[in-house]
Design a protein with these regions (language model features):
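Flexible, active-site-adjacent loop/turn segments at secondary-structure boundaries
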Residues: 20-23, 31-32, 60, 115, ...
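Hydrophobic residues positioned within well-ordered beta-strands of beta-sheet architectures
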Residues: 13, 64-66, 82, 96, ...
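Generic structural detector for well-ordered beta-strands
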Residues: 12-18, 69, 113-115
Length: 129
């Protein structure tokens, strides 16, 4: 794993909210706004942007932690900006704080953890041969 980032470094990711991001359960639309579980996907992606640059050919990252405080809605067509900030590195685990905003409006805050493992170890853990 390449140690190329330090505490305070940031990655930014933008996503326009689409119909696939709305709060639905078992095909039923609950709310016509960006769902918390779609935010979770994009929180993980935001911090993974660090690992894309850090990983070696024989490595892959896996999620270890995710927390989200959903503060306000984001509607279809709105551009959500995710800012992932390195909070700390513990061995091969990267901890990031994440902030999601539409303009000046805070949509969500949270934290992610991702750990770098050898692909061979992941294959064993997942029962793949």
């Amino acid at each position: 794993m390449k140690q190329i980032f330090k505490v305070g470094d940031q990655k930014v990711f933008a996503r326009v909210v689409g119909p696939e991001d709305l709060a639905r359960f078992h095909g039923e639309l609950l709310h016509p706004v960006y769902s918390t579980f779609a935010l979770a996907r994009d929180f993980e992606w935001s911090s993974r942007l660090f690992f894309i640059e850090m990983k070696e050919e024989d490595e892959e990252g896996v999620g270890t932690h995710l927390s989200i405080d959903h503060k306000s809605p984001a509607r279809v067509g709105e551009n959500v900006i995710f800012t992932a900030t390195v909070e700390k590195m513990e061995g091969t685990e990267l901890i990031c704080t994440i902030e999601a905003k539409v303009g000046d409006r805070l949509v969500a805050t949270g934290k992610t953890g991702q750990k770098m493992l050898k692909k061979e170890k992941l294959s064993r853990l997942f029962g793949q041969r």
